[in-house]
């Protein structure tokens, strides 16, 4: 494993920013919180940060895609390859061959590394994102199940690749998918944003559990509008197995408070897809501030004004979770793209539907951090 030494860096540590250096290979091996820039006494590649920031890998909990790919496309299938791999693992001998590779002489070409989701994961990694939640749109039930199967297949394939290849090839797998963020279909029509209205549903715990089973139990976050019929029963049923987030909702303050007390514990992109936070009607944002609930925040300069961004950090502090909410257009040129069966246009960094509704963002999470 190649070793690295980064000197003259501003290190982001639990205690804050510290000037120093860092040594690492597959893991961090040493931190020096000083101006000592002497390289280690072993062979390594030395990099000079010139005072730049060195931060942990980013975790994007809300990203629909980028680099031309979208998790809702449901275009990944590993059935044949995984069947070959599992068959191969049964035969513990070096001469057994399966699907163009040997057990002890592994052929990387056996994996679909050029498929959209592998390319997407490598794009995330190139942007400093080391883990993410694959986020789906409001789709019809058939399409949602297909997306669950596709993401599960990709996760299992990536895990198999990591298990069967040397460390020096692991970057080809890209960032790690930690699970699924189910943004819809249990949303309010009036606050749907770019979600397809025809596919919206009342909160349905049975459907959620079926989707979760189809995903291999990978759903980690689900958004619900708490004012919808059945929302509280849904929250009580689902909150034991994943985080329930309030969002795409016209809920008033009292309803939002009650939903948090019923088990919801997160807010989807604060200020977007919800009622305004007014002095006599604070809505979800005011309820979250009162109870100290973690909130997502899109920092692309379009979804939330920079002054409000600063206010969110002052009010919520460490419970502010930056997200990209990126679409397939992130990392791509201006043009027309699809989103959950709808067309949107990317122009000068703004992704919007034909009626001007913001469709999501075209930034990476690293861009959000910089902003």
Task: Give the location of each predicted region.
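Charged helix-capping and loop-helix junction motifs
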Residues: 115-116, 147-151, 204-206, 279-285
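Short, electropositive alpha-helical surface patch
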Residues: 144-160, 169-171, 234-243
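Active-site-adjacent C-terminal substructures of enzyme catalytic domains
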Residues: 234, 246, 255-371
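Divalent metal-binding pocket/active-site signature
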Residues: 182-283
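N-terminal metal-binding scaffold of metallo-dependent hydrolase/deaminase domains
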Residues: 1-40
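Divalent metal-dependent hydrolysis catalytic cores, especially in the metallo-beta-lactamase
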Residues: 64, 97, 106-107, 118-152, ...
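Divalent metal-coordination and catalytic microenvironments
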Residues: 9, 22, 26, 51, ...
